[in-house]
Amino acid sequence: MKARSTLLIAAVCASTLTACSSGRDRGPPIQVINRVLATAPGAAQPSTIVAREIEFARAAREEGQITAAARFAAPGAKVHREGGVKDAAAALGSEKNPDISDAWGTAAVVISCDGRLAVTQGRYRDPQGIVGDYVTVWQRQRDGTFLWQYDVSGPDVPQPPPRREFEDGDIVVIAIPSIRGLVASCPDRGEAIPAPPAIPIGEEGKAEAWLSRDGTLRWRWEHREDGIKFVAADYYYNGEWVTAIEESLAPRP
């Protein structure tokens, strides 16, 4: 994976995931995120997406994870589960809010030149302590708000060893987490954007690809025979297509 236009956010927390252990909204203050990511061109502001994920997390903690997920979902949103990609409204409508929601934190944001489409990648931990990765696609609506269009997650295999419990007097080194903000290049007037690299055509219902309206960001998913949930995002940067996110996620227990 090539990292371009990497932007760092400093925050005092043991790790991105630990900082978010009681809700997705824990992490760098919004003011810090906005200040560091404000150099993005035009309407494509990664900080807007990070702030939206924090808002979503706060709602999940206060209203319930399923209730919040339904409220923040775009029309026609999809969830990628162990049985494949399903309609979010139907899937969420049959579920109840867990007593404790997952905790998660954003690690990367890739956004189209016009700022209408964004893909986030991050880490999560469920109430049982299982940790893994997630990917969410956000689409800007007519009123300017962002709603999620696609969501998938999967655990680390194998799981990392349990974190050591610290005792009084131990010296703990504080880590500085970072959020990568990747913004697609805006073409010059009259410049044609080349098509993204060709991809194999998957079986109907088991693979799909989407291209942003301005042609600078593509994301796609596959549900593979072994149950692996594959998702990737490519963006147009400095005259070439670059893979920003690529995940092969195992089924959740």
Spans of model-derived segments:
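Short, low-complexity N-terminal intrinsically disordered segments enriched in polar/charged residues
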Residues: S21-I66, R71, P158-R189, P197-P200, ...
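C-terminal motif of bacterial Sec signal peptides marking the signal peptidase cleavage site
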Residues: L17-A19
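Short beta-strand edge/turn micro-motifs at domain boundaries
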Residues: G27, V131-F166, G227-R252
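Solvent-exposed loop/turn segments at secondary-structure junctions
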Residues: K78, G84-K86, R125-P127, G154-V157
